[in-house]
Amino acid sequence: GDVYKRQALAWGEGIDQGQRDQVRQLFTDVGEILELAEAKLDAFLALTSSGPAFVALVAEAMADGAVAAGLPRDLALRLSHRTLAGTAELLDRRDLHPAQLKDMVTSPGGTTIAGVRALERIGLRSALIEAVVAAAERSRELD
């Protein structure tokens, strides 16, 4: 299936309500539609079109870490994929802010907070923010 089943629509001048309704119906048949101002489309594309590559890098790095910690590669990849898929499903199904889920699974002095500290130390959050911003800026350049 599709990685992301949402489409963004920006309406140009001269598109009447009837035409908008027809287009909405067409896209609703294949997934959710979001109506955005045209100025926001580059950010939308950066997150939804480039985002899968960023998440794939995270999945690969997590699997590499598990291999370094002793798991066989095939198992590490399978577990990494399932962890990411399960996390995304949980965030979506329970409508959680990512920080809520992080706090739910992080115990004082435990393994998860040790890993979170390591990620904060190396700047993972900043790196991901910069990746999305860079992709949006490049999208604007290509327009």
Segments the model singles out, each with a brief description of its role:
Residues G1-Y4:
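Short, small-residue-biased leader/transition segments that mark boundaries at the very start
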Residues G51:
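Aromatic-residue-lined binding/catalytic grooves and analogous aromatic/hydrophobic interfacial grooves
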